[in-house]
């Protein structure tokens, strides 16, 4: 039997391209090579596509995915040249141009099956403001927040924050993930510098009420009505808040899987995770991040439609705890991608 082709897209234009490379390398090593041939394409910061490598067997430990200057020495190709009949694409891309619906729309134009969120679920979960409106509509609790826009009167924004929230607050670009551009603000004097930092990444910003809470996450997997969520896991931090460096560079986090929470609280988070996932028409996978306060209140922080996917990332570790190995998880995601593709093709008039 001939092998299936799995195409890995990695790199990308966003500030999170380094995370993408780490995730793609983990997938490259964990793939079931008795079923798949893996072809890899690097997307440069400028958005150009480069075919880098092809693997028919598990690569040696010292073999790495080509990136940056080395990858850019290879010839650039037309983005549409990645097309291969019956191939499945795994877009291991994070942030803008990766999990905001852009690459998903491109792959649908090419009529390729792909792992992960569809256009709607990617774009709606990537936009923190839009996601908040959706979650409010289905009754999933969230912390209080204020929306800010770069072209608005910043003094009026500050006044609204003072009236509606209490310090500390967290300032977040509306369209960015992996804690890029996020600042913790302890008093009014530090609000404007934090807004200026966030506006570097997006002209729309969310200012959220800080809460004294544990950060607990559930992994979600499935399509349509057949969706399941894991027992929650907890981020245990050695830093004040979970920023980009602590996540991916400084290794200052640990994870408790499963999280030490009462069974009824774990069930509540699983129910909220599935409700939020279905509300945004989730496909494939997502990670739902919650705040849990000392008095047992649960708040959905965000849905991450393409969560970090290294072998030490929370998402695959949560499923491993449920008995689904990293390699089997990849195969399940490919099967879900093919299912979504077939459904989409059958619905075209």
UniProtKB/Swiss-Prot annotation:
Domain of life from the UniProt record: Bacteria
Cell location: Cytoplasm
GO CC annotation: cytosol
One Gene Ontology biological process: regulation of cell shape
Assigned keywords, A-Z: ATP-binding, Cell shape, Cell wall biogenesis/degradation, Cytoplasm, Ligase, Magnesium, Manganese, Metal-binding, Nucleotide-binding, Peptidoglycan synthesis
Pathway(s) per entry: Cell wall biogenesis; peptidoglycan biosynthesis
Catalytic activity: 2 D-alanine + ATP = D-alanyl-D-alanine + ADP + phosphate + H(+)
Protein name per UniProt: D-alanine--D-alanine ligase
Lineage: Bacteria, Bacillati, Bacillota, Bacilli, Lactobacillales
